[in-house]
């Protein structure tokens, strides 16, 4: 299975933001318990450390500046897409049950809140990683 969003040209921010969004919520995207939704900063650090060890050589200072913002934006954007689809009768995203897209939206909104609560730490993390030399320079 290939997600065609990953093979077309686009902003690197969307790719890393979506990667972190999908990986750093231990409860997963389909959880029914919103209280279980969280943002795993340690996993985020591991992902960004690995990513920047390679990509740090071609990302600009502005690219790095906006990484935390995209990590916060992508779950909000996806939540809005799920909510819109729910309101339009579930015509875009495949659903297993009534209210499925609404639940997905709520999970993404809760994840956005969790990222927001740790946003200063996320900015500090990116700033710290930015100072580390990239082995690929």
What are these regions (language model features)?
Residues 13-57, 73-92:
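Active-site activation/catalytic loop segments of kinase-like enzymes and analogous catalytic loops
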Residues 8, 70-74:
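Transmembrane helix-bundle signature of multi-pass membrane transporters/permeases
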Residues 1-14:
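Active-site acidic catalytic loop and adjacent metal/ATP-binding pocket
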Residues 40, 60-61, 119:
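General structural signal for secondary-structure boundaries
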Residues 55-62, 134-137:
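Intrinsically disordered, low-complexity coil segments
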Residues 59-71:
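All-alpha amphipathic helical-bundle segments outside canonical DNA-binding/catalytic cores
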Residues 77-137:
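ATP/Mg2+ or Mg2+-diphosphate-binding catalytic cores
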């Amino acid at each position: 299975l290939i997600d065609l969003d990953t093979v077309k040209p686009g902003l690197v921010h969307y790719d890393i933001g979506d990667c972190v969004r999908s990986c750093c919520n231990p409860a997963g995207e389909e959880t029914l318990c919103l209280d279980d939704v969280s943002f795993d900063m340690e996993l985020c650090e591991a992902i960004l450390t690995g990513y920047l060890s390679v990509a740090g050589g071609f990302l600009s200072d502005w690219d790095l500046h906006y990484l935390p913002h995209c990590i916060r934006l992508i779950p909000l954007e996806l939540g809005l897409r799920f909510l819109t689809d729910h309101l339009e009768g579930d015509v875009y995203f495949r659903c297993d049950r009534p209210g499925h897209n609404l639940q997905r939206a709520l999970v993404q909104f809760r994840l956005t809140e969790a990222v927001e609560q740790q946003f200063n730490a996320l900015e500090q993390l990116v700033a710290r990683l930015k100072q580390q030399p990239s082995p690929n320079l």
